[in-house]
């Protein structure tokens, strides 16, 4: 019985040491986070056939908080500014811009300017 108890205690110590070492490794490798400003074209999702969509402004400024390790990563190119237009009828609308990040914890969007864009929906003439 004493031997099993010693093994359990030893296992607990090993697990605690593993968790602590992983935590320290994580902080060292991903801990420092820095602000980064980027510009992205606004992407349109949900276009309906037979309609033209005009977006103004066409670009937005995005502020990210990025882990130092990802500052020069190709993943930054995958940060996107998206508007969803599938429910819009003809006319001019004010639409909120969503920012999508491939790794939201390491490449975290914190601001987008402007937060709203104007979208004009025009039915195509045939």
Swiss-Prot record:
Keywords, sorted A to Z: Membrane, Transmembrane, Transmembrane helix
Membrane-protein topology: Single-pass membrane protein
Cell compartment(s), UniProt: Membrane
GO cellular component labels: membrane
TM regions (residue ranges): 12-31
Protein name, per record: Uncharacterized protein aq_1466
Origin species: Aquifex aeolicus (strain VF5)
Organism lineage: Bacteria, Pseudomonadati, Aquificota, Aquificia, Aquificales
């Amino acid at each position: 019985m004493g031997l099993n108890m010693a093994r359990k205690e030893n296992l607990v110590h090993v697990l605690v040491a593993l968790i602590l070492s992983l935590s320290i490794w994580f902080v060292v490798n991903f801990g420092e986070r820095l602000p980064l400003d980027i510009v992205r074209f606004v992407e349109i999702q949900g276009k309906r056939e037979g309609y033209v969509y005009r977006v103004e402004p066409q670009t937005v400024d995005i502020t990210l908080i990025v882990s130092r390790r990802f500052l020069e990563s190709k993943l930054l190119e995958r940060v996107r500014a998206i508007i969803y237009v599938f429910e819009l009828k003809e006319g001019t609308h004010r639409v909120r811009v969503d920012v999508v990040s491939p790794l939201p914890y390491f490449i975290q969007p914190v601001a987008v300017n402007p937060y709203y864009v104007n979208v004009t929906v025009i039915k195509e003439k045939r």
